[in-house]
Every structure is written in structure tokens, then in C-alpha cells.
């Protein structure tokens, strides 16, 4: 495949015709070695010819670009009268053979966006063209567009850079990204990942979702119901009443920091270290341990073994108070039983003007039903 390297020579004239003595234009033989040469024109203007050293975009090597650049016209600014002048652009082409085997792939690489270089007619080695000076300035200022289809490759670099920038912007889209640090477990290094800012949840919604449910257990230990009752809870519903009376007071947290969050989605619990977090993760696991007698499933095998004591009738837990000796299958039942001996009645009726206390939550639940029934009958 052959590519075209162009040489431009721009002549400013006052008339719209090429001078008669301008018959043939030959490029200098060693233009790459020329740093700056002053030329005298017929109108007394001085122009300079530069040898531009750049990088060959096809081969990836340096080369001396055969581009002839002209000095600006007389005057720092152009008047409206100068804009109407016409400028002759004489383009000379020098053919060189490109031996790069993947040149086709390079020309149509995504780095160049939607731009494409078309081959030109090899017979047209000299093409005089005319262009309006106003249009030329507009193209240089970005208001116009130099089309590669017109045979002008001077703006090829600009097209390539613009196409590459548009390609990158198209890949990024409108999304915004930020780096997020993820802490690893013991023996693992923390790693960084990219997080989409647009897909972040609303901080207010996260805060509301992370809020723990109200602690109603205090109504079981002495706090009285408000006159309007508890919003959202109907104690006349047996299911809601059972959930209400089964609430346990939350254990007070220690003063030590808890920087490790549970990795399970929807769990807001925090832990002091990774080992505590891994131990907690078991409750989120599948309940693969199923009781053969009743079908109740458990996460841990130890919980299943403890449950099976109910079916086997084994009662390893015995009351130690003198003269009692009762035995129980579960330690929880033993702790509840001990309150009978100690006289501890932690469960207090939450209704106003009623101060009855109970040793077991089930007894308090039955007592609350009497209040609800009497209130509905009134």
C-alpha cells in the first residue's frame, strides 16, 4: 500500500490568477536539512521555509516532513478587505512506499475515530486549487472542517487526535467513576476497585435503611404504653403480639471500635475484627442441617443436635436448687425455670395502671390479651 506525503506552498497574490512566470514548481532536493531559508518574493515579502521534524505515524519513526510553512501576512490583524483576497495553495505530492504489513489496520484503528484516508490519483502530482481566505481561517480556527476527501492531508494529525479523544469520551459516556478501597481478610492485601458514582444509592436512603428497628423490649421490662398506643402494632393480632412479647433487650456494645462490617447484603452489624465477622457469617449461610423428625432446619450442626434432644426426650440440664431437681432439654428452659426460685420477674405489664410482673414472657403475653380484650369490649 502506498501513502501520500504532501508538500504545500502558499502564495499570496493580489490578483486571482497565477503569475505568468510561475510555470513549474520543484521541491528542494534536501528539504529535510533546511532549517530556515529566506526567500524574496516579487512583492518584497519575506517567507521562511521550515523543515518540520515529526514522527512517522505509519512506521513509528522520526522523519522530516516536507511541509513549507509561510510567514503571516503583513499586519498583526486582518481587515475585512484582506479577507476577500484569494490565496493560491499549490500542493505537490511525493509518493513513498509503506512496507508496514498492518498499515490498513492502523489507518482504520479506533484511535482514529471515524476518519479514513483515501488514496489519491497518482497522475495528479500537481493540483493548483483556490480557496477563500475567510474559509481558510475558519478551518484553522475550528469553525470549518478540513476534509480528507479533498486531498489535503495537512490536518490529518488534528483529525486523528480529535477522533481518538471522541473515542475515549464515547467509551466513558456520562458516567463518573471513583476508586474505592476494599479491606481484605486476614492474610489478604486490601485492593482497589472502580465504583460508579452514578449508581450510588441515596445517602439518606442508606441511612434510613441502616437504622435499626425500634427497641420495643423496654415495654416488656417496665416502660408503659403511650395513651395512643404503639404505632404500627396491633396487640389484638396474635401473631404481632407473639413477636412483641418475644423481643429481647439488646446487649450493650463494648467501647472498643467495630471497623469490620458484615459482608452479607442487608446486614448492618459491625465487628471488631475479621475473625468475629467470619463467625457471624454462619447465620447467613444455608440451613442444610434438617431435623428428620419435624423438618426444622438449622445453619449449624450443633444447633441441630441440641434440637434433637427435644425428640429423644433427653434432658441434660438440671435445676440445682435444693429440693427441686427438675431437668430440661434446653438450657434456655432451665434459665427460665430458675426465676421461680429466685423470684425474679423481669416482665412487667406495659399498660397504664397495671403493675403485674411475670417470670416468663409467655405469661405476660397471656396477660396482655386480657387487656386488649377488655379494651375492645368497651
Curated annotation (Swiss-Prot):
Weakly expressed by neuronal and glial cells in the cerebral cortex. Expressed by Purkinje cells and in the granular layers of the cerebellum. Expressed in all layers of spermatocytes in testis but not detected in sperm cells. SMART domains: ZnF_C2H2 (SM00355). Residues 39-113 are annotated as: Mediates transcriptional activation. Residues 243-378 are annotated as: Mediates transcriptional repression. It comes from the Eukaryota. InterPro entries: YY1-like (IPR017114), Znf_C2H2_sf (IPR036236), Znf_C2H2_type (IPR013087). This is Transcription factor YY2. It comes from Mus musculus (Mouse).
Amino acid at each position: 500500500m502506498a501513502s501520500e506525503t504532501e508538500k504545500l506552498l502558499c502564495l499570496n497574490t493580489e490578483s486571482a490568477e497565477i503569475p505568468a512566470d510561475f510555470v513549474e514548481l520543484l521541491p528542494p532536493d534536501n528539504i529535510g536539512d533546511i532549517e530556515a531559508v529566506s526567500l524574496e518574493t516579487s512583492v518584497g515579502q519575506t517567507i521562511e521555509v521550515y523543515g518540520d521534524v515529526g514522527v512517522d505515524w505509519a512506521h513509528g519513526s522520526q522523519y522530516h516532513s516536507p511541509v513549507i510553512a509561510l510567514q503571516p501576512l503583513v499586519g498583526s490583524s486582518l481587515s475585512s478587505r484582506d479577507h476577500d483576497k484569494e490565496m493560491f495553495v499549490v500542493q505537490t505530492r511525493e509518493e513513498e512506499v509503506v512496507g508496514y504489513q498492518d498499515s490498513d489496520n492502523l489507518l482504520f484503528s479506533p484511535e482514529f475515530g471515524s476518519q479514513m484516508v483515501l488514496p489519491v490519483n497518482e497522475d495528479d502530482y500537481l493540483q493548483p486549487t483556490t480557496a477563500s481566505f475567510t474559509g481558510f481561517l475558519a478551518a484553522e480556527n475550528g469553525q470549518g472542517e478540513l476534509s480528507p476527501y479533498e486531498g489535503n492531508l495537512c490536518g490529518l494529525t488534528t483529525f486523528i487526535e480529535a477522533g481518538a479523544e471522541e473515542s475515549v469520551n464515547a467509551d466513558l459516556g456520562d458516567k463518573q467513576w471513583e476508586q474505592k478501597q476494599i479491606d481484605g481478610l486476614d492474610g489478604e492485601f486490601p485492593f482497589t476497585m472502580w465504583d460508579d458514582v452514578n449508581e450510588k444509592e441515596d445517602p439518606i436512603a442508606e441511612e434510613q435503611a441502616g437504622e435499626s428497628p425500634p427497641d420495643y423490649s423496654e415495654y416488656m421490662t417496665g416502660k408503659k404504653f403511650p395513651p395512643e398506643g404503639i404505632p404500627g402494632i396491633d396487640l389484638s393480632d396474635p401473631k404481632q403480639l407473639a413477636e412483641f412479647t418475644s423481643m429481647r433487650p439488646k446487649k450493650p456494645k463494648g467501647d472498643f471500635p467495630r471497623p469490620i462490617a458484615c459482608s452479607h447484603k442487608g446486614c448492618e452489624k459491625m465487628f471488631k475484627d475479621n475473625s468475629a465477622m467470619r463467625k457471624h457469617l454462619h447465620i447467613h449461610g444455608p440451613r442444610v442441617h434438617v431435623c428428620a423428625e419435624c423438618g426444622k432446619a438449622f445453619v449449624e450442626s450443633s444447633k441441630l443436635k441440641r434440637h434433637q434432644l427435644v425428640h429423644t426426650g433427653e434432658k441434660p440440664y438440671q435445676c440445682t436448687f435444693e429440693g427441686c431437681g427438675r431437668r430440661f432439654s434446653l438450657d434456655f428452659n432451665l434459665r427460665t425455670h430458675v426465676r421461680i426460685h429466685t423470684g425474679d420477674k423481669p416482665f412487667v405489664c406495659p399498660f397504664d395502671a397495671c403493675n403485674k410482673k411475670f417470670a416468663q414472657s409467655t405469661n405476660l403475653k397471656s396477660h396482655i390479651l386480657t387487656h386488649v380484650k377488655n379494651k375492645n369490649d368497651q
